[in-house]
Amino acid sequence: MKIKYQEKKDLVQELKSKDACAKLVCETDIWKIYSITTLEASKKYGRDTKWCISGTDNTNNYYWQQYIKYGIKFYFLITKNNYNARGNDSKYAIIIIDNKYYEAFDQQDNHVKLNDIIGIDNVVIPGVNLATLQYKPMFINEGPHL
């Protein structure tokens, strides 16, 4: 279904409202890092990935709700200028659990560790100390999988 906008300002307002759910929290020479707070933002910024919370089928809402139930925070790293960070990955998802643990995924939905992501040393996420987070892929067997 195509949406027709009566005026350009209507389109601009629509785009701004969708972006309100994804906040740019850090920008480096390589990355733009977004805090993702809604399913709509996850689908928009996670486009062209295999992340279950960013897909276009009906299951993405289920997975999103399961993660939210656990109080998980989502951050998407998106490369600038098509910089190829690792193989073909230009996007990474980082989930933060209780500001103690993390899981990270490449575009193909494979687990990665933070130190495997080029340029992660320059990434600053407000309120999160990436250096002290422990890698804990808890959701492989215990619950939903990103």
Q: Where are the model-predicted features located?
A:
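Catalytic-core elements of nucleic-acid end-processing and repair enzymes
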Residues: 1-146
